[in-house]
Amino acid sequence: MTRASKRKSDVQNSAPAKSARADSIRSASSKVSAKGYQRIDEIFNKYADKTSGMIEPEGIEALCSDLEVDYTDIKILILAWKMNAQKQGYFTQDEWRRGLKALRVDNINKLKKSLPELKKEALKSVNFEDFYLFAFRYCLTEEKQKCLDIESTCILIDLVLGFQYPVQVDSFIQFLKIQSDYKVMNMDQWKNFLRFCEEISFPDLRNYDTCEAWPLLLDNFVEWFKKEAV
């Protein structure tokens, strides 16, 4: 046999061995992944409804009890954000897996301990707008719903923004409750109120320009606030 033929034979013989090693590595990795999901799924199954296969409002209340947080606590909304949950009050198994894998937790105690850091993550400037917009979408409970009623808006905006901008939020909520022109709020108005809080000097409003592209709702709020301040 020539040297070239021998080298070719060696390459051919080594190919099955390499393939077998690769299969072995993939198999081991798959087992580790499956084991990780098994623990995560065990928690999910504790709270999930047996018929729907999802964690429903009753299950989330039980989860909150075990986590020792209130059902209306912002941490639960942030957890839903981490899972990228699509329907308010419900967690699918895929959403649950996504969230807990990202948090690197596989039991309730670890999940409970992760919540304070998760809150810090969501409130970082690089993440907050994404969380803020998610909060609005998450509360749109009906199919093709685009707007949120004013009462729900007031509750939500106080929850997600009130601790950062208490004066602006309190004043805006007061305005929303007494005005009669708007029964709902849309995403553009919601997004621009965050921009308002971040950019506009308050309460003097010296840099608010009605000629800029602000929603009429905010123009009306500014006009009302100036009259109230007199």
Report residues per predicted region.
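Short, tandemly repeated low-complexity microdomains enriched for cysteine and small residues
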Residues: N109-L115, D149, D170-S171, D204-Y208
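Short amphipathic alpha-helical linker/capping segments at the junctions of internal repeats
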Residues: L115-E121, F172-Q179, Y208-D219
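Surface-exposed polar/charged interaction patches
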Residues: K50, D66, D70, E121, ...
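Conserved binding-pocket/active-site segment within a compact domain
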Residues: F134-Y182
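Eukaryote-specific, cytoplasm-facing alpha-helical/coiled-coil scaffolding segments in long proteins
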Residues: E121-S125, I157-G162, S180-V184, E199-I200, ...
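EF-hand Ca2+-binding helix-loop-helix modules
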Residues: T2-S52, P57-I60, D73-K82, K87-K144, ...
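C-terminal interaction modules of eukaryotic adaptor/scaffold proteins
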Residues: V184-M187, K191-V230
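Amphipathic regulatory helices of Ca2+-sensor modules
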Residues: I55-V69, F91-V105, L148-F163, M187-I200
